C-alpha cells in the first residue's frame, strides 16, 4: 500500500503524458518526485553512506528502460501513429538525450558577455508572473547538431551565462554548491523547513540538462505549497534521536 501511494504520482503523470502525448508532464513529475525522495531519505538518514545501493541501481535500470519505451511510444503517437521507423526514432532519441552537449558547445563558442540579462532567462517564470519582464515562449531556437538533426535544448547553463556571464555563472555555481551543503546539514539536524531549498536544489540539478526549472511557475508552486504547509501547520520535530536517526513529526493541536 505504501509503495503504491509512493509511485501513484508517477503513474498519474504517465497516464496524462500518454493522453497528451507530452514528455514534459512525465519528466517534470519524475524530477519533482525524485527530489522529494532524496529529501525524504536525507531526513530519515536512510543509507546515506550507500546512496546508490542495489535497490537504487535496479530502480534506475528499470526507470531508464521505461523512459526509452515511453519516448518511442510518445514519438509514435506524435507522428499520428504513422510508420514507426526505427532509425528516425533512434536519431530523435539520441538528440533528446545527448543533443544538449553539442548544442551548448556550439552556442557557447558564439557568445560574448556584453549583453547580460540579470536573471531574465533563468528566472523567466517568476519575473513574467510579477510583470517585470515578458517571457518569450518557446525558450530558445533550434540549432543543427548533426546533418539535418536539430535541438533547442541547451541546458540551464545557457540561461545562467546569458544572465550573469561565464565568470558570473562560475561564481554562482560555487554559491549554489555551498548553499546546497548548508541546507543538507540543516536537514540532517532535523530542521525540516530546509527541505524546501534542498529539494529545490535537487530538482534544479536534475532538470538542468534541459533548462532552468524556474521557467515554469506551475513547478515552482510545488515549493510554495510546501512552504505554506510548514508555516501554517507549524510542525515540531521530536528531539528524540536514536541510532536510526529521525523519529517522526508531531503537530500542534
Task: Write out the residue ranges for each language-model feature.
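Hydrophobic alpha-helical segments of polytopic membrane proteins
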Residues: 2-79, 86-87
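Hydrophobic alpha-helical segments
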Residues: 152-253
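Alpha-helix capping and helix-coil boundary motifs
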Residues: 3, 81-85, 133-136, 209-214, ...
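Juxtamembrane/interfacial segments around transmembrane helices
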Residues: 32-39, 57-69, 110-121, 222-229, ...
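Short, amphipathic, aromatic/basic-enriched membrane-interface segments that mark the entry/exit
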Residues: 1-2, 140-143, 188-194
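Small-residue-enriched transmembrane helix-hairpin modules in multi-pass membrane proteins
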Residues: 60-179
